[in-house]
Curated annotation (Swiss-Prot):
Gene3D superfamilies: 3.30.300.20, P-loop containing nucleotide triphosphate hydrolases. Residues 7-168 form the Era-type G domain. One of its GO terms (biological process) is ribosomal small subunit assembly. An essential GTPase that binds both GDP and GTP, with rapid nucleotide exchange. Plays a role in 16S rRNA processing and 30S ribosomal subunit biogenesis and possibly also in cell cycle regulation and energy metabolism. Residues 41-45 are annotated as: G2. Residues 147-149 are annotated as: G5. This is GTPase Era. Residues 15-22 are annotated as: G1.
Amino acid sequence: MKKRKQYCGYIAIVGKPNVGKSTLINEIIENEISITSKKKNTTQKNILGIKTKQLHQFIYVDTPGIYLNNEKDDSFKIIKSSILILFIVDRTVWKTDDEIVLNKIKKNKIPIICVINKIDKILDKSIILPHINFLLKKINPIEIIPISAKKRENIVLLENLIYPYLPNNNHIFPKKYITTHSLSFSISEIIRQKLIFFLRDELPSIITVKIESIEEKFKKKLYIRAAIYVKHERQKKIIIGKKAEGIKKISIASRLDIEKKINMKIYLIIWVKVKIKK
């Protein structure tokens, strides 16, 4: 029996911070694999989201704020190996940050689909068409589509636009895969999300969450030890809070979300440590 052709390719999701890249990839994959927040630059690493629909495998990459990074970093390597770029813009707003991102991605001459996100927040819909015309001239995309990632408006339509551009390639990942990230990574992302939620503007800009151990002990319960690394003692005090109320809230909220994600009871210990300079 003749083997049917398979189609597979990487699709880079780019845009300035806070345009909804992480929300979009979560809605496409229909699973929260990338953290979302109103705080800028919440995505610190390239997040891979995989969606396999029969013969077609779409590998979406949620890139962190690429316009600030070195062109030799992983984000740009991913973009160069992509077959398509989803360039996300925020409603009818065009700023210097958008211009910087556009100039970076145009160098690679990879086809661009322009995605106008958050259209649910536009009250006067008559301003959308003039902005589409502006973007057509500015970006010269192969397609342009208004969506609301948060409301799932036009998400399926966007996916349908991508189909024709997938090249004839064998699938890279097994059918059931939705991301390449480990359990440790997923847990660390949940903890980081809670840090952002509870601390907001007080959150240190450079912060690392490391999962030190995951052990399954009696009664089928996971014991997880995590460490939050900060640069200064002052930052440590901010996270812990008065009478340890801050870290308590973060720990409880993290535990509940982790249990929901893995469908298993856990015991979570979170330490806050000052990173020793080498």
